[in-house]
Regions:
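Short beta-strand-to-loop elements that line the ligand-binding cleft
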Residues: 1-3
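Solvent-exposed, polar/charged alpha-helical surfaces in well-ordered, non-transmembrane soluble domains
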Residues: 5, 9-13, 65-72
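A ligand-binding cleft/hinge motif common to bilobed small-molecule-binding domains
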Residues: 5, 12-41
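Residue-level marker of intrinsically disordered, low-complexity segments enriched
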Residues: 7, 40-44, 163
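A near-ubiquitous, low-amplitude feature marking generic local secondary-structure context
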Residues: 37, 50-53, 150
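Extended ligand-binding regions for polar small-molecule ligands
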Residues: 44-121, 130, 167-172
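C-terminal functional modules
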Residues: 107-172
Length: 172
């Protein structure tokens, strides 16, 4: 077909039996189609790997660092078992890694606009850790990774400790 829109149209009108595409785009479209009452599924087989991540403009290294470290912090929080509902229990931790995660700005931001020492607490309070955000974005959001449109367990989207490729450098 000519483009992704045409492929989708052919699939929906029955001209073809299978429709492939970028996983994140297919998930977004599947949500819309389910809202229209269609019972469709995304098959687990991947034809290609298309890593996606946050992007920032080229000329703002400070902003790029903040975006990257928010991601690393969300991963690190999950590794420590810290999430959007319990991070307050860890604020006074004597574990140096947890203390850096929750109580240090890591030198991020700019001289005129540095991050606060509690920036990661703000992130966790707003969106949670990586698990929380994934569950809310790709699953039913009940906290149990149920009814996921893109499975995480056993895939590259999981933490390194669980066989995936998601990891973060030390928070320093």
């Amino acid at each position: 077909t000519e483009n992704a829109a045409a492929a989708q149209e052919n699939f929906l009108d029955g001209s073809c039996g299978v429709w492939t595409g970028d996983m994140s785009a297919m998930v977004a479209r599947l949500w819309g189609l389910r809202d229209e009452g269609m019972d469709l599924a995304i098959m687990p087989e991947l034809l290609s790997k298309e890593p996606l991540g946050a992007a920032t403009r080229d000329n703002d290294d400070d902003w790029n660092d903040v975006v990257a470290w928010v991601w690393y912090g969300m991963i690190t929080a999950e590794e420590f078992g810290i999430d959007g509902s319990n991070y307050g229990d860890f604020v006074a931790s004597e574990n140096p890694g947890i203390n850096r995660l929750l109580n240090s700005n890591l030198g991020l931001g700019t001289d005129a606009n540095p991050l606060s020492d509690t920036w990661m607490q703000d992130v966790l309070g707003a969106v949670g850790n990586y698990y929380d955000a994934y569950d809310r974005s790709f699953c039913d959001g009940d906290g149990g990774m149920n009814n996921c449109l893109i499975d995480r367990a056993g895939t590259l989207n999981d933490l390194v400790a669980n066989g995936g490729i998601q990891y973060a450098p030390p928070m320093r």
